Design a protein with these regions (language model features):
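Acidic beta-to-alpha connecting loop that harbors the catalytic carboxylate
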Residues: 56, 205-207, 232-234, 293-296, ...
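N-terminal cap/lid segment of alpha/beta-hydrolase-fold proteins
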Residues: 24-48, 239, 245-285
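Primarily recognizes the serine-hydrolase "nucleophile elbow" in alpha/beta-hydrolase
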Residues: 114-183, 345, 353-411, 416
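The feature captures the conserved acid-bearing segment of alpha/beta-hydrolase catalytic domains
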Residues: 44, 162-221, 280, 392-445, ...
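Alpha/beta-hydrolase active-site loop
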Residues: 95-119, 329-350, 365-369
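Post-His helix in hydrolase/transferase enzymes
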Residues: 238-253, 334, 459-471
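Histidine-bearing beta->alpha loop at or near hydrolase active sites
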Residues: 87-88, 231-238, 323-326, 451-457
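Short, surface-exposed "cap/lid" segments of acyl-processing enzymes
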Residues: 46-77, 82, 280-315, 319-322
Length: 475
């Protein structure tokens, strides 16, 4: 690098000051502090937001330059959370964790932010970053499971980051240590083999910090990544007419993408009010229909992976997003009535006589309450239920406390399992998952199944699907 990112950031501030004089940038509507992010600055759209943006600053911190850019997005209907990368990375380095995995931090921030601000319906967030923040949002998207983020927009991207801790192995992103005079100064990220969402990078052709030829070569190695070249732009982004139109166009392309890989374009009227995603069966369709309640992260990594594996074996899946569903308060009886609607509609629509129910994490916690309250006709359709990573209590509403680690108002799951009605159920848990209630299951209709890994089962989606299919009754 020819110049430091911090010096260039100060140049950008001078350019942004002109924008302030024209009334583009404004003070944040509020601040709050959350976990290792520290103080987060909030910029709201005039109406109910259409998108949520997690915007990470460069090495200069959350200053006028990134503020002006955040304000541009509020005019487009976004709610923007401004993050100071200096504070975040400092807290990451101070933590007791041996390696770095950032996707879960940004996911938790999005959940907390939207609940705290009273967003009516949960919105899948978009990641945006400038300079070192551009690098961080790329790495976060690369390690995130599909469905967590809409995508990421990087402004002034370099593939290196001043991060001393190593990146966690198996997280989807790889990096090599960056040494200067024999001392570890950071990491150099490698091109990701795949990304979980759309990534667009704005690249100044006269950027003397993140050189265009090297950056372009890096990005072109990543499937689906897109680079937007800016002929008259360096690393400072000071002259608005040279980058603002491309910036807003890139943001629009990311947020216009459908977040789910295979959703039903329009759900049928009987279930149109529910957050469902249809995963069609591939090849020869079986006699079984699966309804899958996701974990509290929404219809994302494990849920999508297991559903895709089942679809390969001919089982069509109705995916149910627990994050969006329980964003509004629910009751066991009300949730059971909604499940009844789903079972009756799709069993009739797809001509299926047998239903496989699956729940993961929060979906597993709540599913026993729903099954035990199903009407007799729907109950008779259920041939097997698989509970993945069930805990000892269930919550039927998203609470801020869930993401602060001090939730204590859940309903015990043990009594529901003890009074389980109908067909048998699988209680599948990872051997490292200390919070699972499956290990205590003895007798009754439950079949404990121990698998490798922890709460996320080490990403072994095919193995989970195979275990479930192995127990399907031969009807």
């Amino acid at each position: 690098m020819t110049f430091s990112k911090t010096v260039i950031a100060s140049v950008w501030v001078l350019g942004a000051a002109t924008s302030l004089a024209r009334g583009v940038a404004a003070a944040p509507t509020e601040h709050f502090s959350y976990a290792r992010f520290g103080e987060v600055s909030i910029y709201r759209a005039a109406s109910e937001p259409r998108d949520v943006v997690l915007f990470v600053s460069g090495d200069g911190g959350w200053n006028l330059g990134v503020v002006a850019m955040a304000e541009r997005l509020t005019a487009a209907g976004a709610l923007v959370a401004g993050i100071d990368i200096r504070h975040y990375l400092a807290q990451v380095e101070k933590s007791n964790e041996k390696c770095v995995s950032t996707a879960v931090d940004f996911e938790n921030l999005s959940h907390y932010l939207q609940a705290k601000l009273g967003i009516k319906h949960y919105l899948q967030p978009t990641l945006i970053g400038y300079s070192s923040g551009a690098t961080l949002v790329y790495a976060t998207l690369a390690e995130a499971p599909e469905g967590l983020f809409k995508g990421a927009l990087s402004i002034g991207f370099c593939p290196d980051l001043d991060l001393i801790k190593p990146v966690c192995k198996g997280s989807g992103i790889e990096a090599l240590p960056r040494l200067e005079k024999g001392k570890l100064k950071g990491v150099n990220f490698l091109p990701a083999k795949q990304l979980s969402g759309k990534w667009i990078s704005l690249q100044g052709q006269i950027d003397q910090v993140c050189l265009a030829p090297q950056t372009t070569q890096f990005i072109e190695k990543i499937p689906g990544a897109e680079i937007v070249t800016l002929p008259k732009v360096g690393h400072g982004y000071s002259v608005e007419k040279n980058w603002v139109p491309q910036y807003l166009a890139a943001y629009t392309r990311i947020t216009a993408l459908r977040p789910d890989a295979t959703p039903a374009p329009v759900l049928p009227a009987p279930v149109a009010d529910l957050p469902l995603t249809i995963v069609p069966a591939l090849g020869n369709s079986s006699a079984w229909l699966a309804v899958f309640l996701s974990g509290d992260g929404g219809w994302a990594g494990l849920d999508r992976g297991v559903a895709a594996a089942l679809a390969k074996h001919g089982v069509a899946v109705v995916g149910w997003d627990s994050l969006k569903y329980f964003w509004s308060p629910r009751t066991p009886a009300g949730a059971a009535a909604d499940l009844d609607r789903v079972l009756r509609h799709y069993a009739r629509e797809w001509n299926k006589a047998h239903v496989l129910l699956i729940g993961y994490s929060q979906g597993a916690d709540t599913l026993p309450f729903m099954v035990n309250r199903l009407p007799a006709n729907s109950h008779e359709l259920v041939g097997l239920t698989a509970l993945l990573g069930i805990s000892d209590s269930a919550t039927f509403e998203f609470h801020l406390a869930n993401w602060l680690g001090n939730a204590s108002d859940g309903i015990p799951t043990a009594p529901e399992l003890a009074h389980w009605k109908g067909s048998r159920y699988l209680c599948i848990y990872g051997e490292e998952d200390l919070d699972s209630a499956c290990a205590q299951q003895t007798g009754g209709l439950g079949i404990p199944v121990k698998m490798a890994g922890g709460h996320h089962f080490g990403g072994s989606y095919e193995a989970i699907a195979a275990e479930i299919l192995k127990h399907l009754p031969n009807l």
